Amino acid sequence: MQLLKDRIRKDGIVKQGNVLKVDSFLNHQMDIELINEIGKEFKRLFEKEKITKILTIEASGIGIACIVAQYFNVPVVFAKKAQSINIEGEVFATKIESFTHKKTYDVIVSKKFLKPSDRVLIIDDFLANGCALVGLIDLVISSGASVEGIGIVIEKGFQSGGEIIREMGIHLESLAIVDSMNAEDGTVVFRGDK
């Protein structure tokens, strides 16, 4: 998605340790006009999948998932990273290791909100090593629902997550795939760049 790549080049900040900061427009302060375009693009990419539910994980994916869900006219469910007194009844649970925060989370979704009849589109802001997505896929499978696709805003193509998910045979669409980044000069090279 050229609009997204241009914005990453303009406002993204490359840090040491393969960190790409996009908090000025995507996952802290959110540019709703850009995210609307992201929502339209995911609708175009997954419109044949008959999606009934959007699933993401707290916190960065929630805003993006909500905009995407408007184009599909379906609810959003977000996996919580901790058991809460607000969640009543039984839950689907898995463990997810976070690349960003370097810790393992117990992640849960109430059984009330994922049913075997659901056709789920998973949405997230980043794909790095794939641990979060594998955990979300596990939650969907545990519910008996089907993963119809995964929409990622930014994939770090130099890490293994995309390959892991594609080898599972799941329809994965990443709007920008970063093949390399240089913290010294701030450059980002996207897949398909010449």
Swiss-Prot record:
Q: Which GO terms describe its biological process?
A: purine ribonucleoside salvage; xanthine metabolic process; XMP salvage
Question: Chief location of this protein?
Answer: cytoplasm
Instruction: Mention one GO molecular function.
Output: xanthine phosphoribosyltransferase activity
Alphabetical list of InterPro entries matching this protein: PRibTrfase_dom, PRTase-like, Pur/Pyrimidine_PRTase, Xanthine_PRibTrfase
One Pfam family of this chain = Pribosyltran
Entry's localization field:
Cytoplasm
Annotated residues that bind xanthine are located at: 20, 27, 156
| Pathway terms, separated by semicolons | Purine metabolism; XMP biosynthesis via salvage pathway; XMP from xanthine: step 1/1
The EC number of this protein is: 2.4.2.22
Query: Mind listing the UniProt keywords for this protein, alphabetically?
Result: Cytoplasm, Glycosyltransferase, Purine salvage, Transferase
Q: Which residues bind 5-phospho-alpha-D-ribose 1-diphosphate?
A: 128-132
Name the catalysed reactions: XMP + diphosphate = xanthine + 5-phospho-alpha-D-ribose 1-diphosphate
- Protein origin, superkingdom: Bacteria
* GO cellular component entries: cytoplasm
Assembly: Homodimer.
- Function, in words: Converts the preformed base xanthine, a product of nucleic acid breakdown, to xanthosine 5'-monophosphate (XMP), so it can be reused for RNA or DNA synthesis.
The entry assigns this protein to a family as follows: Belongs to the purine/pyrimidine phosphoribosyltransferase family. Xpt subfamily.
- What name goes with this protein? Xanthine phosphoribosyltransferase
The organism's lineage is: Bacteria, Bacillati, Bacillota, Clostridia, Lachnospirales
